[in-house]
A protein has these predicted regions:
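PDZ domains, with a preference for the canonical peptide-binding region formed by the helix
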Residues: 2-27, 238-240, 244-249
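Short, surface-exposed secondary-structure boundary micro-motifs
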Residues: 2-3, 29, 170, 232-233
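Extracytoplasmic/secreted cell-surface and envelope-processing proteins
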Residues: 7-8, 35-37, 208, 240
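Serine endopeptidase catalytic core focused on the charge-relay Asp
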Residues: 42-210, 214, 223-224, 232, ...
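Short loop/turn microsegments at loop-to-beta-strand junctions
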Residues: 216-218
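Short, solvent-exposed mixed-charge patches
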Residues: 255-256
């Protein structure tokens, strides 16, 4: 009936209201192409109509907030795009939110098997709205009071160098900790999210996590008291190593 559907509840409601429950016409987007087809419904013993479609209208995940601009309250997180695992496509965000969360445990990384942060989030603690999901991270507006934390100057790409640095991340509860890393290589490829190759040489972090784990994406990389980038990927064959994106790329994307 030419009604736009934005969630599963709307879809089920319209199916119940339609007169012809044998076949319904639907229009959908695949990439940039619009398609129309007929959908055959099946009625269960409980008088519930099934479409045979796999449909979901939301996705959740654990990641790390990289920065908040104190002047504009724009924020950036993750340092890479969110991919829908079933389609392999970048997820289009229309009404995203970031929430306060607490790390409850760590599944350690091992060679060939990345670990992850286990966390719980409080849906009543909305910290901001997400408006963009890009190759450089997710971006939006921080809507609560900015925490009274240390401000970092931003390093230019040409000032990032190999050698000592650190990452800021949470591995227990809400406590932000600094862990030592060593930057091995710099890649100035303009389109890459792997500008910085580093290894962890912090014994505590290696002991507790086995290296980089999922959920650390977005963790700020600090060098000489400047923010230089954010963690983006783990080296699967050696989880003590990881990649990061230049912070300047994330800031440029946020401003756009």
């Amino acid at each position: 009936n030419n009604t736009d559907i934005t969630n599963i509840e709307d879809m089920l409601s319209l199916i119940e209201k339609t007169n012809n429950k044998e076949n319904i016409s639907i229009t959908y987007m695949r990439g940039t192409k619009e398609n129309t087809t007929n959908l055959k419904l099946s009625k269960t013993e409980d008088n519930v109509y099934k479409t045979g479609l796999y449909v979901k209208d939301s996705i959740t995940g654990v990641g790390t907030l990289t920065f908040i601009d104190p002047n504009t309250k724009l924020f950036g997180a993750l340092g890479h795009e969110i991919i829908e695992k079933n389609t392999g496509q970048r997820l289009e965000i229309k009404d995203g939110k970031i929430y306060g969360s607490s790390v409850t445990g760590i599944t350690r990384s091992d060679i060939g098997k990345p670990g992850e942060k286990n966390a719980k989030y409080d849906s009543s603690k909305v910290f901001g709205t997400v408006s963009e999901n890009t190759s450089s991270g997710i971006f939006g507006k921080y809507t609560t009071d900015i925490p009274d934390k240390k401000l970092f100057a931003v390093a230019k790409e040409e000032n990032v160098k190999t050698g000592k640095a650190s990452i800021l991340t949470v591995i227990d509860g809400n406590t932000i900790e600094s862990f030592d890393i060593n930057i091995l290589r710099i890649n100035n490829n303009g389109n890459s999210t792997k500008n910085i190759l580093f290894e962890i040489n912090d014994e505590k972090l290696l002991k507790d996590t086995g290296g980089i784990v999922q959920g650390m994406s977005g963790s700020p990389i600090i060098q000489d008291d400047y923010i230089i980038g954010a963690v983006t990927h783990v080296v699967v064959d050696d989880p003590s190593k990881g990649y990061g994106i230049f912070i300047t790329k994330m800031l440029e994307e946020a401003e756009n």
